[in-house]
Amino acid sequence: MSSIRVKQYDALIVGAGGAGLRAALEMAQSRQYKVAVVSKVFPTRSHTVSAQGGIAAALGNVVPDKPIWHMFDTVKGSDYLGDQDAIQYMCEQAPPSVYELEHYGLPFSRLDDGRIYQRAFGGHTRDFGKEMARRTCACADRTGHAMLHTLYQKNVEAGTHFYYEWYGIDLVRGAQGGIAGMIAMNMETSELVFFKSRATIFATGGAGRIYETTSNAYTNTGDGIGMVLRAGLPVQDMEFWQFHPTGIYGVGCLITEGARGEGGYLINKDGERFMERYSPHLKDLDCRDVVARSILQEVMAGGGVGPKKDHVLLKLDHLGEKVLRERLPGIIELSEKFANVDITKEPIPILPTCHYMMGGIPTNIHGQALTVDENGKDQIIEGLFAAGECACVSVHGANRLGTNSLLDLVVFGRAIGLHLEEALKTELKHRSENPDDIDAAIARLKRWEKPNNVENPALLRQEMRKAMSEDFGVFREEQKMKQGLERLQKLNERLQRAKLTDTSRTFNNARIEALELDNLMEVSYATAVSAQQRTESRGAHSRYDYKERDDANWLKHTVYFRDGHIAYRPVNMKPKGMDPFPPKSRD
């Protein structure tokens, strides 16, 4: 085994977004455990900062609401692929989780009576779909920003140890099974360190950078997914990628669904509010997969605007400048900067943009990572946990409802912390590491400096994103996906011959981007293989050649292993103390 420095902790959190900070805080506040957070960016620059719309919770501050209505909407929104035990837990924990954030100091927008302001959001209804709910707790249109700063400050108070600008290279398995920790690199010096931990928690976020147009930050490169797959562990439901309906045309930056929740609506070239045709009941506030497909169908039918007739418009000016500046100040700024549009006077050009990864590392409601044994049974991976976008509990199924993402972060980040407070007392011990994993991580680093390698990693990344966008976008079909998989296979062969031109050791961003490319390719492969084998349309996975949902054959989770093997897990239809919501049409 290669000799590298070792740092030892009770719990190691990888990623400093909402999920990572919430998990860290739960343990650090107990003052019982040594907790470290490793992040490749400063914590308040994590991607949670870009979440605009709010966090869902059935508080009933504006109109009466119930957690069971929230649960119904989430199950239906997931196109019935969400696990109902996990969804029930999340929706019931939503109100106390929001009040907890309020007590931490998160500056929510307020109603006149001082209670938390709540706005309407797509797919959220009252009384099992009868009318729109006001469920989204908002801090203007910067809720994620406020949450991240609040949680970071509380972690500083609690004494959490931060390693920011450190990059996770690979997991280290235990010699007798389980996970012993992770190899990470100090981005400032390129020093490698083995973080040995009793519990390793992945909160590494999404991987939207596999697509050309995305709302995701440059840092969202699927690092946790790549590390898990290289460790021989599976990921789940990777065919499901949410394309947010309202990305700024040509850029991909997000216009929050809260803009439509406040009363904005989509129009075509004739100024028609076309969502009234596609979704007469919920209109512009239908589920995101429905609205995104409707926009593209409208464009293909000739309703597009602009010189290329290839996008539509989001109208907000009718709301008035006072409302816009009070409720959507960030959108005013974004639109001016990236679309050169004054939303108080004119509509915003928009087109769907890759936004969210519904799949990820399979877990239970305690955040414990799972694999599937040869008999198809769930097996807990000792010492490994996951929460947030890199995890698949699964509360989002085939399509996520807006504002359930921030809720997912805090509920399951907290759940991991609560579980570990007890598990670290008795169950979880330090494991002897597998030396081969440390050697393999070092070899992966050295591969990029082989003198005979010639391929440019930056060009390979461009070609990969182009292949994913063209062959695995909003609409899919067999021949295109087969073509896309062949393109990825050739790119992967070239990737093994890629070379760094800059081999310096100090803040070498080219080295980090090359390592990220390994992870992006792992995510792309998982997406491509999973998408090709699911012969139905469900939620965000929409196929021209299989247009209907097929519950008889496909009401199950796909579990992908790195060798291309696909296993399956049943959807959990057993909420506690109540009957499940049976699959129905979402029309």
Curated annotation (Swiss-Prot):
Disulfide feature: none
One GO CC term on file: plasma membrane
Keyword Electron transport: yes
Positions of substrate binding: H244, T256, H355, R400
Gene3D superfamilies on file: FAD/NAD(P)-binding domain, Fumarate reductase/succinate dehydrogenase flavoprotein-like, C-terminal domain, succinate dehydrogenase protein domain, Succinate dehydrogenase/fumarate reductase flavoprotein, catalytic domain
Keywords, comma-separated and alphabetical: Cell inner membrane, Cell membrane, Electron transport, FAD, Flavoprotein, Membrane, Oxidoreductase, Transport, Tricarboxylic acid cycle
GO terms assigned for molecular function: electron transfer activity; flavin adenine dinucleotide binding; succinate dehydrogenase (quinone) activity; succinate dehydrogenase activity
Cellular localisation: Cell inner membrane
Positions annotated to bind FAD: 15-20, 39-54, 223, 389, 405-406
Catalytic activity: a quinone + succinate = fumarate + a quinol
Modified residues (Tele-8alpha-FAD histidine): H47
Enzyme Commission numbers on file: 1.3.5.1
Membrane topology: Peripheral membrane protein
Superkingdom field: Bacteria
Quaternary structure (record): Part of an enzyme complex containing four subunits: a flavoprotein, an iron-sulfur protein, cytochrome b-556 and a hydrophobic protein.
Name of protein: Succinate dehydrogenase flavoprotein subunit
Organism of this sequence: Coxiella burnetii (strain RSA 493 / Nine Mile phase I)
